[in-house]
């Protein structure tokens, strides 16, 4: 993969990010949870001004303020209780309960929306979570927050997942997709 680090757990395809950047043609892009740098690499190739932040570099989106405004934000947060990136208590994936996770995620999404320029786009890549037979449709909760004008929902197929390597007993059906929610801040 020419973007980011394909061995980084939770990495997304740079081709998705590139398609979004080529479609929306932003001047300033923010990725507040940049992980392995996929969005950074795409922006470098497309010659778009980029700002990347991440908890591993000392930026905590829940508690820290974002400096500047952006006309495109790509947000691919960690999911609750799936991948443990480290033991940092501020890592969303380490939230002890689903409700605490969703509360922190809502703070993040609200901050990002406020950081958007008028007419700007917030793209959120999010999947569903299954635990103990229950489905947690994260995308649906975000949509119900009504943070801006939802203009598109893209269903993205997932590849190279650890769940593909696992044998499940019973009638468990693994999740093989994520959603890209496209919100627009009205001009």
Describe every region a protein language model picked out:
Residues 1-187:
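Class I S-adenosyl-L-methionine-dependent methyltransferase catalytic core
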């Amino acid at each position: 993969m020419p973007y980011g680090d394909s061995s980084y757990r939770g990495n997304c395809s740079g081709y998705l990010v590139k398609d979004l950047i080529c479609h929306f043609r932003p001047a300033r892009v923010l990725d507040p949870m940049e992980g392995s740098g996929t969005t950074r690499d795409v922006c470098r190739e497309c010659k778009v001004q980029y700002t990347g932040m991440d908890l591993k570099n000392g930026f905590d989106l829940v508690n820290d303020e974002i400096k500047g405004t952006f006309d495109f934000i790509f947000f691919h947060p960690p999911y609750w209780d799936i991948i443990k990136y480290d033991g940092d208590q501020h890592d969303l994936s380490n939230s002890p309960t689903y409700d605490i996770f969703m509360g922190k995620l809502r703070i993040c999404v609200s901050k990002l929306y406020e950081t958007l320029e008028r007419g700007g786009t917030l793209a959120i890549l999010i999947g569903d979570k299954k635990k103990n037979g229950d489905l947690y449709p994260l995308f649906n909760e975000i949509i119900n927050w009504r943070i801006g004008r939802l203009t598109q929902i893209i269903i993205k197929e997932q590849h190279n997942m650890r769940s593909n390597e696992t044998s499940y007993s019973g009638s468990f059906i693994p999740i093989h997709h994520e959603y890209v929610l496209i919100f627009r801040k009205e001009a």
